[in-house]
Curated annotation (Swiss-Prot):
Keywords: Acyltransferase, Cell shape, Cell wall biogenesis/degradation, Cytoplasm, Magnesium, Metal-binding, Multifunctional enzyme, Nucleotidyltransferase, Peptidoglycan synthesis, Repeat, Transferase. Its EC number is 2.7.7.23, 2.3.1.157. It is found in: Cytoplasm. The lineage of its organism: Bacteria, Pseudomonadati, Pseudomonadota, Gammaproteobacteria, Enterobacterales. Binds 1 Mg(2+) ion per subunit. One of its GO terms (biological process) is regulation of cell shape. Acetyl-CoA binds at residues 380, 386-387, 405, 423, 440. This is Bifunctional protein GlmU. PANTHER family: BIFUNCTIONAL PROTEIN GLMU (PTHR43584:SF3), NUCLEOTIDYL TRANSFERASE (PTHR43584). HAMAP family: GlmU (MF_01631). GO terms for molecular function: glucosamine-1-phosphate N-acetyltransferase activity; magnesium ion binding; UDP-N-acetylglucosamine diphosphorylase activity.
């Protein structure tokens, strides 16, 4: 179906008292992203011409968190109901566009469901998203005559007979801009709450002889709202279960789908294996045959084919070439890069450092602001001393260098190709190619020396 241009209104003015938080409710995160950001992303994916965000409490925090989104900010100074919120946005509606109404605390609404709702909207009428519940207590009921939707009655205003209706309003609807503005202008607050209900436009449309078409979401979780942290945690598990299922069906081996969290986007090759309690954040790419051990956190990184990341390793903003091995208990910070076949072992930290092909840093090492060549051995306890208290400096190590244990390289410094650094050395000057650098104090030995003893 050919759709009109469309704008989206997202209601996000609520305080979220039951969250017991200083943070606006819609900024609490699901899968590592603010609830309202999920909704904004869905609106943008639908091709919304404009996204109007109706806000109230915590406006400064919202604007700071969402500063990168192209939003039209609409203030609702007093929270007088959903209809009142839409009235604040109405001056921005074009007559010839469709207006889709969404909620910042309903984060799992899918683009597919919204597109079906958009396609189903009748000319001059309203598309309405509804669901049927075994226990509809507290929700607005859908009233019908001869199968046609005639209105929505809120639970507090419903008769005993109406409260037996199981079909309820989700709050998500779409209509033409000109019609929406006209109906909004007719709303009153003559109800138990003393608020302006957006749901009253359904009856107004019916009275004008307009058609109202109800559409159901694919999953109930799509229209579940969040009012407290318990509800948020439940939706988190729903979301994670869905993501895990998609990955399993796509060929990724998750050892326990219930103990896997995806907080971003995962692109993967074939025969990828992910153990328990792994967290994927941001945009992550895993090549073919990658193995990730338990307890790892991988964020905004590209992991090449045949890499193996051992348990409890943290990788952030990193590029790993093929066949690298990492961990356990390693930390690769932003700017770390490993070339093919490189190895980083336990309790090694890297930042803004490149480790060349076949090079290895086995244990207890810090490599920062460093460029390390191919086939280099970094001994245990090696530290690149890159910071003088004010500025950072670089360490350059050529190919085929052997760095002994407990070595400090005080940057800026360069170690030439094939050089050897003796264990316990503090390198403060450049080392030439194929040279031996040693700076430790000569060993002395005192025969028959006795350790001090405690006085009685």
């Amino acid at each position: 179906m050919l759709n009109n241009a469309m704008s989206v209104v997202i209601l996000a003015a609520g305080k979220g008292t039951r969250m017991y938080s200083d943070l606006p409710k819609v900024l609490h995160t699901l899968a590592g992203k603010a609830m309202v950001q999920h909704v904004i992303d869905a609106a943008n994916e639908l091709g919304a011409a404009h996204v109007h965000l109706v806000y109230g409490h915590g406006g400064d925090l919202l604007k700071q968190a969402l500063k990168d989104d192209n939003l039209n900010w609409v203030l609702q100074a007093e929270q007088l109901g959903t209809g009142h919120a839409m009235q604040q946005a109405a001056p921005f509606f074009a007559d010839d566009e469709d207006i889709l109404m969404l909620y910042g605390d309903v984060p799992l609404i899918s683009v597919e469901t919204l597109q079906r709702l958009r396609d189903a909207k009748p000319q001059g009428g309203i598309g309405l998203l509804t669901v049927k519940l075994d226990d509809p207590t507290g929700y607005g009921r859908i009233t019908r005559e001869n199968g046609k939707v005639t209105g929505i009655v809120e639970h507090k205003d419903a008769t005993d007979e109406q409260r037996q209706i199981q079909e309820i309003n989700t709050g998500i609807l779409i209509s033409n801009g000109a019609d929406m503005k006209r109906w909004l202008a007719k709303l009153t607050n003559n109800n138990a709450q003393g608020e302006y209900y957006i749901t009253d436009i359904i009856a107004l449309a019916y009275q004008e002889g307009r058609e109202i078409v109800a559409v159901h979401p694919q999953r109930l979780s799509e229209v579940e709202g969040v009012n407290n942290r318990l509800q948020l945690s439940r939706l988190e598990r729903v979301y994670q279960s869905e993501q895990a299922e998609k990955l399993l069906l796509a060929g990724v081996m998750l050892r326990d789908p219930a103990r896997f969290d995806l907080r971003g986007t995962l692109t993967h090759g074939r025969d990828v294996e992910i153990d328990t309690n792994v967290i994927i954040e941001g945009n992550v790419t895993l090549g073919h045959r990658v193995k990730i051990g338990t307890g790892c956190v991988i964020k905004n990184s590209v992991i090449g084919d045949d890499c193996e990341i051992s348990p409890y390793t943290v990788v952030e903003d990193v590029n790993l070439a093929a066949a690298c091995t990492i961990g356990p208990f390693a930390r690769l910070r932003p700017g770390a890069e490993l070339l093919e076949g490189a190895h980083v072992g336990n309790f090694v930290e890297m930042k803004k450092a490149r480790l060349g092909k076949g090079s290895k840093a086995g244990h207890l090492t810090y490599l920062g602001d460093a460029e390390i060549g191919d086939n280099v051995n970094i001994g245990a306890g090696t530290i690149t001393c890159n910071y003088d208290g004010a500025n950072k400096f670089k360490t350059i190590i050529g190919d085929d260098v052997f760095v002994g244990s407990d070595t400090q390289l005080v940057a800026p410094v360069t170690v030439g190709k094939g050089a050897t650094i003796a264990a316990g050395t503090t390198v403060t000057r450049n080392v030439g190619e194929n040279a031996l650098a040693i700076s430790r104090v000569p060993q002395t030995q005192k025969e028959g020396w006795r350790r001090p003893v405690k006085k009685k």
